[in-house]
Amino acid sequence: MEFWVVSIFDTIKEISMHPITLIYLVALLARAFTLTTASIQFSRRAMSAMKKPRLFAKTALDVLSEHTVIVADTGDVGAIAAQKPQDATTNPSLIFKAAQLPQYSQLVDDALSSSEGDIGLAMDKLAVKFGIEISKIVPGNVSTEVDARLSFSTEKTVAKARDLIAMYAEEGVGKDRILIKIAATWEGIKAAEILEKEGIRCNLTLIFGLCQAVACASIGKVTLISPFVGRIMDFYKAKQGVDKFAPAEDPGVISVTNIYNYYKKFGHKTIVMGASFRNSGEIMELCGCDRLTISPGLLDELRSMDGAGYEKKLGLGAPIYDGGDEIAMDEETFRWMLNEDEMATEKLAAGIRGFAADIVKLEKILTEKKAKP
């Protein structure tokens, strides 16, 4: 820098200010500025590199992905695209939230315009339209849920599932890409039994008790179940008056682990997909589960965590199930076991009510939007 400044002043003294001299002077100044700027930029990059934290050899998400299929739990198409999961799941609550985002207003408009004023039909079309957009991003399955208000009608659940599959087919998405989500009531499990025989694969959700999981595998012979973790933890935190559980002692983690080991011990082919997580500790404690459906926020958290110290937890050697013999399940046994499980009874009912409430809210939004000129 000093060399170029001296050169400039020497030149000014020795030569007159003719046009050609000005050009020469400008060139010298430009070169000095360029070199100085480049030096500053290099220094900034060097400092930035020094401050940048060392990258992990593996993140927690890397470790998890080696042993478990990752599924995105959201209705936000953009969030799914950012996460690049294998599969994606939706439910009425997630669709309700996504439908209020401005970037999906066109999907809402299309669902309304193609339903000829039928709000119920528009609801189904909207769920399918979200599913179609998601299917363009994920290479695997998309789960679309049946109206929770049909949870106690086998016949109506079957009819609705067939309608949803037909809507997907009209848009060129085959049933091999879709899982129909159904609440794991007795009626829902019997509906899944019928649908599975027709080649319509089912994801039985809101599973909180072993009796639900056993019935899904032995009677419904369903493709996949979604046993919940976080909501079970919520119940026992409130009941026991504690703030938190260590991951290995989390009642939700223990429940899913028990279901997983029961299936593996007795040879059931139904896929276990843990759901409803409250923290990353719950997730990593279930590393090795067939699948885990995880919210975008927790996926980001796992991606930022050092994977050192985490390892596969489920599926190590012979399954450890100490609950006795295989359960001979029928309707009477199912209803009695569910009745005796306070947590499962309460959470199943609350889950159905919650999904139904969000369906009503979404119907209201569509009705109001339809009324606008």
Name each region found by the language model:
Residues 19-42, 49:
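N-terminal chloroplast transit peptides
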Residues 51-75:
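N- or domain-start disorder-to-order transition segments that initiate the globular core
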Residues 68-73, 86-90, 140-146, 178-182, ...:
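Hydrophobic faces of well-ordered beta-strands that scaffold small-molecule active sites
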Residues 91, 144, 180, 216, ...:
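Conserved, mostly hydrophobic/aromatic
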Residues 153-157, 182-196, 211-215:
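Active-site-adjacent beta->alpha loops and helix N-cap segments on the catalytic face
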Residues 208-315:
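Catalytic alpha/beta core domains of metabolic enzymes, predominantly
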Residues 313-373:
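C-terminal extensions of enzymes
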